[in-house]
Each structure stands twice: as structure tokens, then as C-alpha cells.
Amino acid sequence: MPIDIVVPVYNAADDLNRCIESVLAHTSGDYRLIVIDDASPDPAVRACFAQLEARRLPQILLLANERNLGFTLNANRGVGAARPDADVVLLNSDTVVTRGWLDALARCAASDPAIGTITPFSNNAEICSLPRFCENNRWPASRDAEPMVQALERAAVPTYPDLPTGVGFCLYIRRALIGAIGLFDPVFGLGYGEENDLCMRAAAAGYRNVLCEDAFVLHLGGSSFGDKRADLAERNMRILLDRHPQYLDQVRAYITADPVRPLRELALSQYRLLSEPVPGVLHMIHGHGGGTEYHVRALIAASCTAFRHYLVIAVGDEWQLEEHASDATRTYDFSRLPGEPWSDFLAGICARFGIDLIHLHNISGCRDGLLQALSSAEIPYGYTVHDLNFACPTITFLNAQHRYCGAVTDAAICTACLAAQPAFAAVGIEAWREKHRALLAQSAFLIAPSAWAASILAKYFPQHAVTVIPHGNAGGMSRPDAVRSPLPMPDDGRAVVAVLGAIGPDKGARRLERLVELTRERGLALRWVLIGYLDRGREPFQSADGVFTMHGAYDSRALRELIEHYRVRLVAYPSAGPETFSFTLSEAWAAGRPAIVPPIGALADRVGETGAGWVLSDDEWSSEELMLDRIVAVLDWSRADEFNEAVTRARSAVQPTLEAMTAATVAIYRALPQPAGKARAAAQPISAARCLAALHYAPWRPPPAAAPAQLPQQAAAPSGNAARDPLAHVARAALRIRHTRTGRALYRLAPASLLAALKARLPR
């Protein structure tokens, strides 16, 4: 199908030169370029035409009006000069086309004979703008557009989604549509609204207005038609709304829904990959939250300029992938297809997002599949020991009686222990450890957050070197479910002991309940507050006698204030199992509170090293009665000097910093070879269609088209009657939505003169 490109011109010779040269550089095939000057007073335009004429390019037709016709008639004359069998592209003179632009538009047109108009993506095209929707995204002249073109090509299925209207900066118009409904209506004069009217008439005639999501045309926002266009906005908007009263509602609904956001998100993801030459790191965790997730998010935030970070939260076949970019976090909900090999699933994700390194933090969410995939992956991976999962499926080393086993390595003892726990009875411990031995053997690095965690790893897998990098405190993490209003705490002089975090059985939930019960039975002058929640309930709660208060979920950035509010003197850890680090201990010390901890794991090591608290004896830890005795003794005012010394040590405890943790981890990343490029090139990227489905893409469907109202060629003068004035209706609607996202977007799209006219129609 031949295609003729019509460029209406009014002044702005520099824009015109740039536009023409871009068309000549990036357009091929059966096309003709029709450039029509609307009697521009600028002599530079005539000089530009003379230069073009001197080049004698057969594909260029130059036309000039003897008098100024206005944009609408000028565009119509240009379209009228097109070949009678050619589709037409109306192209503003302040645009710059890019590689493959016209081929992409032609493919779009060929995909469906019902397509009437086509608009490409642009930096400045209202509802077809990217990266920011409905905004003029400034594009410096020095910035290369090719990465964006490649990104759109990589992200395209294509789907060619419907639009409520095309955008006139670059509008492909099918010849059959011109034959069916005609050209732009001359009633729109010098311009504004003529393309919207055309698109609404196209829809009424059964044609589609669509977005071509694999084409990109820069719109650099020159002054092709001068300032008079804004002056005509009020008049032309009235004509448009009289003819198509549904127009504004459709556009408003479209902006509110923003249905092409997934298309933009995927394209921007690929643009980032092409334009940011930094390595990509894929972090993998389970979906249980807690300290592991806190650590990973802090590491990502602290090194986001040096690496492209992606976080997978894996739950079986469902992988939620977060892409952490400087402008936003994009979330993809991927599902492994039935029968799809795990190796293909992982390799496809790595190829799509340019992954150079996989950092495993916890694999309990998809163990078997991930082990299979990693065994065949050519992308280096490493492992941070956040729990004891590699050595025991219980993760916590707790037996059937919920007691710490002592990190037994004897397979016979472990088999008997697991057999007594229904959830793990079918696990063969020797096969379990062999799988993880193979995983660790291929790891490019192993990191432990504490010397204790490193020693446990060495106990089970002594052949592997481990680097100890303590977790740095990022200053807290926000959570949307945090309780914002703390419960009152009676001020009666009773000592308050706090437990911090989400407390399940392994963290000592049942032991805490028993400690509260014993406190009541003994009538102790003691209160317990859980800043967090129990596995049996998350809602804030306070017992009638005030002995136990449960705050609920908290924002860790507010923890110090909560500790002060609840008048906490001591932080207790009634844990049943060991910890590999404990962020809450760091937070307790940062608030100047000493801690009393079990005699196992990193808690015991950290308190022992600093003296910022007390380590329970084995007997005290094994018995809630003896544990409570020790807590009461610690809080006894007769031992105030000892307690105050622990407070001083807590306040002065040297805390691992986020900066040190990040620097040490980044040094490990950078020391690794980077052979992943070849592996990605050999792998089949997960398809754009699956990525869009993972972003929950749902194309917009236009409502049934209404036939346009018939108007005379001259617009009626304002009646002054608000009930009959469509702009009065628009003004009232705009007032209702002025502070919404949709309202702000519409405000950006409207010229100043139209906004002034709308404001004038509001009641005083």
C-alpha cells in the first residue's frame, strides 16, 4: 500500500529542516513526502523550500499557499494532493521520526481493515506519551532515540490497542476512512480539535483509532502553527462537544484507567536495560517477609545506581518479580506454564531482564524447581545464609517438642526427628543435604550475616569458604499495615518488658504466652508489650489487667518512638530456636535498651561481645519459670548499677552500617566474572505477551459509537445559557475532579484560553 506523508508548515524553519531530514533518513518503501507551506511570513521557510527544490528528490512534493488558509484547510489541501490510492500520514513539522517508524505504522494498518487512524508512542503526545502519561516529556536534542525504538520493539506483541482519539502530531489515516467520512472539517479553522472530530466520526463509522506501540516519533513541541491555535480552543471545543457530547467522558475514563500503562512499563524496563550499562542482579527470597526481605530491600536501595536490581518472591510456580528502577518499582506476576522446564523459566526471565548474577537469599518457596534450574544455568549465582534451611527442612532446628536440637549432623538422629513431625516426615535428610551441597558447590560466593551462621554452614558443609558480612541497619522499613495509633500504657511504676517483631512458635510465641500467665499468677509488678503481633492474631490488643499489650504491625522507622511510648526498660527474646542475625536486636540497641537473649545463635554471640544485655543460661532458657526469675532479677532496682551499665553498652554498641554491608557485598559482585551475556544471548527471553500478562494488561474497549450531531459549517455563538452551553457542563465536571489524577492530566492537556473559559463559567 503506498503511503503519502503530509507535513503542514507555518514558520519554524529549524523544526521543518529537522523533520524533513529525519523522514529522509528513516523512511523507505513506496512513500511520498508532501510539504505544504501555509504562507509563512518567515523567509527562512522559503529558503528551506528552495534548498529542498534544488535537491530534486523524486519523493518530495513541495506546495505553497498564496494566502494563509489555517491548519485545517492546509492539511486538507495536502491530503488532497496525495495519490488517490495512498494511505496518509499527517505529520507535524516539529516532529522527528525514528528508524522503522513508517513500516511499523503500515504493519499496524495491515493487521485489521477496521483500523482507521493510528498514533505512535511519543515523548509528547498526551495519551500516547511516555515515559510519563499525559505529559510533555522533554527530550534533549543530544539524546539518541534509538534505545527507545529498540525498547518498544522488544516490548511489543504487538496488540494495537484502541484509543478514544488519535493525537494529531503524527496521525496515520487509512484511505478507506477518508473515502467514508471525508477529511478534516473546515469549521475548525486554524486548528485545535479537528483530529478529535475526525476520530470520533471514524468511530461512529465503525473504524478503530489505535496506538501503534512499536513505533516512536519524537514531538519536540515547536511553534508550527503559532499562538492563534490556543485562542481558538474555546470555540472549537464547543463545536467538538456539541457534535460528540460523549467525547470528554470517554477521554476522562481512558485517562483514569490508563490501560496502556503495562505497555509503557515493559518498554521502559527494556529501555533501562539498553540505556543503563550496569550489571543486572536477580535476588530471590521466599514470601514470608521478615528480616530477610528487609535486608534485601535495603541492599537494593543502597546500590541502585551501581546495579539494576530485580527481586523475585517465589511461591511454587508463582514468581512475583519486582524491578527496582529509579523512577518506579514495576511488579510482574509470572506463572510457570504447565510442563515448562524450570531451566527455561529461569533462563527466560534472565534473558528478558538482562540478568548477570543471581543472589539467592532463601529458596524455600520453590526449592526443587530452582535447584533444577540453577544446575543448568550459565549465570553465576551466590547465596546468603539467612536461615538454616540448607541443613534442615525445619529451617529452625526445632524438634517435635519445639526444642532446639543443638544442630545435630547425625543423619539417623535427624531422620528420627523429622519422622516425628508430620510436615517433614517424607523428607530424606541425606538427599536433602546432598542437593544443597551441590547447590553450594556451584555458588560463586557464600555470605553469612554472623560468625555463628558461618560456623553452622561450615559444620554441615566444611568444604565451602564463607564471608561474614553483618546486616547493616537501613533505618527502618515502611509497611502499609502498620498500626499508627499506639495503645495507652498505664503509668504505675511497673517495669515494662518488650518483645519485638512477628512472633510465631519458633520465635517463642507459646513461651511468651506462658511468661504473661506466670506474671499474673505471681502478681509481679511487671508488664509485657509485644511491639508486633502473634501467630494467633494480628490486631492490637490489651488485656483487662494491663499485664499484656500487643501493638500490632509497626513501621520499623517508628520503633524508637514506640519503645519510648510503651516505657520499655528491657527487650526480651523468648525464642525457641536460634537466630542468624536479628535486626530487632540492632533496633533495640539503637533505642538504648539492653536485651536478654537465649544462649544460642547470633543473639548470644552479639550480646556476649558487647555486654549490652544478658545471656540466659541453658537452664533458664529451657524453663519459662527460671527465665522469668532471671528477668525479674535483672530489673531489680537493687541491681540498678548493673542495669545502667548494660544500657550504656547498648547505646554505644558498634552497629553494622548499611554502607559497610553494601560496600562489602558490591565488592563481591564486582569480583565475579561476567559470562552471563553469552548465556542470555543463547536463551529464549520470556515473551512480551507473558510480560504484559504478568503486568495485568487489559486493553481498553471503546463504548458503542454514537452518530455525531449535525452542525452548520459556522460555529454558533455562545448563548450565555449554562443549561445549553456544553462548556458550562465541562466546567462543573472539571471542578469535581480537579484534584484527582485524571483532573490533573486533563488540566495539562487543555490550553490556557480554554481553562480561562471554563473558569468563567463556574458560579461565583
Placement of each model-derived feature along the sequence:
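A conserved acidic beta->alpha catalytic loop
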Residues: 37-48, 67, 535
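Glycine-rich, basic loop-to-helix element that forms the pyrophosphate-binding segment
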Residues: 64-82
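Nucleotide-activated donor-binding/catalytic signature segment of Leloir-type glycosyltransferases, i.e.
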Residues: 53-61, 537-565
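Conserved donor NDP-sugar-binding/catalytic core segment of glycosyltransferases
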Residues: 95-136
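Short, acidic, metal-binding catalytic loop of nucleotide-sugar glycosyltransferases
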Residues: 21-30
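Membrane-proximal helix-turn-helix segments that form the acceptor-binding/catalytic region
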Residues: 406-445
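A recurrent flexible, glycine/aromatic-enriched loop bordering the glycosyltransferase active site
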Residues: 73, 124, 138-176
